[in-house]
Amino acid sequence: MFYSKNAYLSMKEMTVNAQYILNYLLPRGWTKNAICGMLGNMQTESTINPGIWQNLDEGNTSLGFGLVQWTPATKYLNWADRNGLKRDHMDSQLKRILWEVDNNEQWINLRNMTFKEFTKSTKSANELAMIFLASYERPANPNQPERGTQAEYWFKTLTGKGSTGIQLAQFPMDIINITQGENGSFSHKGTLCIDFVGKHEKYPYYAPCDCTCVWRGDESAYLAWTSDKEVMCADGTVRYITWVCVHDENLLYNVGKKLKKGELMGHSGKGGRATGDHLHLNVIEGNKYQGWVKKPDSALAGTELHIYDVFAVNGVEIVNGLGYDWKTSDWVDGSDENNGDDKDKDKDETKNIVNLLLCGALNGW
């Protein structure tokens, strides 16, 4: 639930929207500090309201619109229309902000911090509010310390439980040594499959996340798995994933078996059509196993994903990564990023609201 209308929101309504934004961005790798720094700015810009027009002048596209008051409004509106998104929907505007992070849009590095670095920062919410003000909003009057005060308020007030249960998808081996890459001429033509060898034959690999076995193919020596929940992928995307591990000569599990992240999943091998001991991996988006297709070589049916975009390589030794963009991640499984001290929350809440009113934070722009 969130509020979206061409009107100034009340503190109660802003709190609902602020919590929604926190819950949306935490699982996508943002720190609570960064989110609250941005919220401190959104409060002044829009009363944290995706449906508001600057000065309530609805339809005046030369002015600002939305959470961060994109100006002119067409900067956001045209993008939303091109992507088939509802203009005044909270998710649409948060997707736009995530797109700006990924595409280096809107942000000008005026405080020695990129937009991507901002999203991961553990500096204080107050300081991050000032960085967001300078590098993203860039108003005519840069002297607005109340935005930092507002950021501190949100940091103390919001519960920060948005990422509970989200796990990082971890590469299943402790070594990367590729023998055949994507579109490999031997047996990977047209696919994103990759073959890996371990430090010795029958090398163990482990569950990259909590998952369930959804298919067993004895003739081809493979098991198919789906993540039990959406996972944080190496590229920063939260999604369900389905994958196959092929060539284990002694398949350990049957359909329906559940594994916890880090539990033994299998071993490299020569089962099926293999000329040497290795692990064959292929990953698709979603939580539905759909069988195989020819591309012209065999791959999972569905939207294939680059393995290096899915599995983080934290602690993994890379012997031969074929130059692919393997990534580490600072995501902590189940972390709610709630580093604030809630002991004094109740007695501070009234004082913070009064401070916000005194500094004119609810007047907008």
Curated annotation (Swiss-Prot):
The keyword Transmembrane does not apply. It comes from the Viruses. Residues 1-159 are annotated as: Lysozyme-like glycosidase. Zn(2+) binds at H188, D195, H280. GO terms for biological process: cell wall organization; defense response to bacterium; killing of cells of another organism; proteolysis. Essential for tail assembly and the production of infectious particles. Degrades the peptidoglycan layer of the host cell wall and thereby facilitates infection of host bacteria. Acts probably as multifunctional enzyme that degrades N-acetylglucosamine polymers (in vitro) and cleaves the peptide cross-links of the host cell wall. This is Morphogenesis protein 1. It is found in: Virion. In the N-terminal section; belongs to the glycosyl hydrolase 24 family. The active site is at E45. Binds 1 zinc ion per subunit. Disulfide bonds: none annotated. Residues 166-365 are annotated as: Probable metalloendopeptidase. The keyword Cell wall biogenesis/degradation applies. GO terms for molecular function: hydrolase activity, acting on glycosyl bonds; metal ion binding; metallopeptidase activity. GO terms for cellular component: virion component. It is an enzyme of class 3 (hydrolase).
